[in-house]
Every structure is written in structure tokens, then in C-alpha cells.
Amino acid sequence: MTTMAETQTWQTVLGEEKQEPYFQEILDFVKKERKAGKIIYPPQKDIFNALKLTPYEAIKVVILGQDPYHGPNQAHGLAFSVRPGVPAPPSLQNIFKELHADLGVSIPSHGFLEKWAKQGVLLLNAALTVEAGKPQSHANIGWHRFTDKVIESLNDHPEGIVFLLWGSYAQKKSQLITNLRHRILKAPHPSPLSAARGFLGCRHFSKANQLLHEMGRGEIDWALDEKVS
């Protein structure tokens, strides 16, 4: 017997949204900006990596970011993650510090979080593109409408999901998460500006696994392998 989750995919829950005129306008805007010679991150092929790597039916945990990294070779479509060989930015360093303090896992030499994504951790930014060197430059081109729809579709997910909301921006999205089967954990943002105010010490990784266990869902192996392809 197939469950409701197994019959739903990103295509079934977002297919109609992608037909909306505003969605095509976003893609056209990004295309036009690239054509005009502007550097846009992440590369075109990586924009929807979060949805490609973490199937709707497999989602267990959601970590929300604001927008992609705006430096060279960093962003590749997963919130907080950077490509192999690129130094971990400060927020990600603090995530690793907390992971080490919480679960005792060693701090990796890279910041490539694909292993999390493939286990059911959706690493979703609210805006999916950004202009080089200009944080939040694409915050108002329509992405938020689309990613709010993503969150609303997760609220309807038939399995319990743990949402990790770090910082006031992510926490505002909790109003979209109304289904009582889900669990929400909140903490300050891991940025150096706020990490010491309660992100460090939040123990969200062990708490998420405990909640998944209570919901009868498999836990996440948060430890990252030293070798990445």
C-alpha cells in the first residue's frame, strides 16, 4: 500500500505554482540579468538544487536560510552549504561548532552539506538567486512567494517534519507551519553577530533526531565525511 507521501512529489505539489506568470517572470529576470553581464549566484543549473537533492516524499528536516552566498564559487543551491574546496563561511563554522558541542562529531574540513540533503534535510533559501557582492539583491523579484509556497506544501506533508528556524527572518515563516504533526525548533541565527546569544548551545541537531525518533522516522547522520566528490 502506498502512503500519501509516496504519491506526492515536488512536481505534484508545485507543478501548478510553476505555471503562474510570476514564476516565469522570475526566471526571465534572472536570464536577462545574466545576459546583461551581471554575475548571478548560484549558477543556473544549481538554482533548484535543494528541491532536486531532497525529494518531497523524503523530507524529515527543514533548515531555512535567507539568500544564497554572494561570493565567488560559494553558492550551489543549498542553504548554508558551500562547494567542496571553498572555506566554510562564518555562519557555517558556527553551525559546525554547535554540531561538535552537541553530538561530538568532528568539525569537517569542508562545508559541502549534500550528505544532509540526500538524507532528507531540505536546505532552503527564501530567495534562490543573488547578484554577486549584493546580499538580498533578489529578495523582491518573486522568490519569496515561491518559497513560501514550498513551505506551505511542507505544512501539508503527511509525515511529521522538524523545522529548524534560525534567526528572526526564518522564525517569521513559522506562521506558515500550522499542522500539529510538525515540530518547530527556534534559535538565534548562527551568524557571528548573534550565535553567542543562543545559537551556540541550542542542541538542535540532537533535538531534531530525538523528535524524529519520537515520530517514528529515521534519524539524520549529521557527521560529514572528510572526503567529498
Swiss-Prot record:
<dbReference type="Pfam" id="PF03167">
    <property type="entry name" value="UDG"/>
</dbReference>
<comment type="function">
    <text>Excises uracil residues from the DNA which can arise as a result of misincorporation of dUMP residues by DNA polymerase or due to deamination of cytosine.</text>
</comment>
<keyword id="KW-0234">DNA repair</keyword>
<keyword id="KW-0963">Cytoplasm</keyword>
<keyword id="KW-0378">Hydrolase</keyword>
<feature type="active site" description="Proton acceptor">
    <location>
        <position position="67"/>
    </location>
</feature>
<dbReference type="GO" id="GO:0097510">
    <property type="term" value="P:base-excision repair, AP site formation via deaminated base removal"/>
</dbReference>
<protein>
    <recommendedName>
        <fullName>Uracil-DNA glycosylase</fullName>
        <ecNumber>3.2.2.27</ecNumber>
    </recommendedName>
</protein>
<dbReference type="InterPro" id="IPR002043">
    <property type="entry name" value="UDG_fam1"/>
</dbReference>
<comment type="similarity">
    <text>Belongs to the uracil-DNA glycosylase (UDG) superfamily. UNG family.</text>
</comment>
<dbReference type="InterPro" id="IPR036895">
    <property type="entry name" value="Uracil-DNA_glycosylase-like_sf"/>
</dbReference>
<dbReference type="GO" id="GO:0005737">
    <property type="term" value="C:cytoplasm"/>
</dbReference>
<dbReference type="GO" id="GO:0004844">
    <property type="term" value="F:uracil DNA N-glycosylase activity"/>
</dbReference>
<keyword id="KW-0227">DNA damage</keyword>
<dbReference type="InterPro" id="IPR018085">
    <property type="entry name" value="Ura-DNA_Glyclase_AS"/>
</dbReference>
<dbReference type="InterPro" id="IPR005122">
    <property type="entry name" value="Uracil-DNA_glycosylase-like"/>
</dbReference>
